[in-house]
Amino acid sequence: MADLSLGMTAAAANASRAPRLLFIDNIRWSMIILVLSMHACDTYSPFGNWYYVDRQKTDLGTALFFGLYQSFLQAFFMAALFFIAGYFAAAAYDRKGFAPFVRDRFLRLGVPTLLFMLVIGPLTQYFLSWTWGSGGFAHQWFKHIRDGEWLSETGPMWFCAALLVFSIVYGLIRRSGRSEPRISPGDDRASSLWLAGFVIVMAASTFLVRIGIDEGASVLNVHPGDFPQYVLMFAAGALGCRGNWMSGLPERFCIRFGTIALVGSVPLIAVLILFGGGLQGETQHYSGGFNWVSAGKCLWEALVCVGMGLLMLAVYRRHFDRQGPVSKWLSDNAFGVYLIHPPVLIGAAILLHTLAWNAIAKALLLTALAAVGSFAASAFVLRKSPLRAIV
């Protein structure tokens, strides 16, 4: 990635007019299904935070599986969505300019977030997760609004709230006359140096932010220690639009260095598990602080993030750059699923409460039920309502 030039480029203009990248749509709905999987795991695993939990006593093997799987997902799936969002934000700004760009982001990100905070979230908490007090829904809802509790109740829509902030900041930067440098795919050596530097910056910035922040801290319903990764991936997406990375990064490069990153992450996570305290139930160092465990985990997350991103790009671009009726339907409903899945998933979890299955098996079943129910709710309710324009 050795070719750098400043200013508006022909590549960016071409990206704005390029045919739709169907493999990106397929990555997007795949990541949404992983969101459902994560929240299903939050329901049954010893880790995570969710509206409704149905935890049972788990053995070490089950706890280790959940810890590894959830940490693995957390390391890359939302970051991938931020990268995609940054990529298309750059192209959207090129087409629209500042005011229409920001107005469109408010409509497509702000309105659904407010809908969740004011309607879907309160209904879910009162009628399904039972996390609100007594006194009737209307009473609790007005109390929720009056006391300002709704401002911190973004739920899973924290992603859209954060993305709205990122988009506005990006728009202001572009309005000031600055633009991303064009970093086009070059020789493998130059590209590998850029990637190595990106991994190091991501790991170091995440580690530094997590040093002094409490494990339970939250901004927009997400831990501040995760923001460095999200900001960097959004910025990388905008740079990727300038350099046409989605189509231009060579497949062999993506596979080679994606594999190197993931293979390198395996001994690192093994050391973190064996010697970081997790097997003894001492997990506090994994979340932050000035210690080698937190530093190692931040590096592991960065390796997984970049490695999975490169491999997904190569695999989806080669094998899934097309859509039939089913994949088109899944793609059309992906955002609606993200918006509506909490009450659907929690309702399914309540129905499964008496099922005497292993926690892993129940999480798999809950994922499947939530996916079917959420896609159906999006297709036959949300997309047949006035909300169709924004979901």
Which sequence ranges carry the predicted segments?
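Alpha-helical transmembrane segments and their immediate juxtamembrane cytosolic regions
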Residues: 2-391
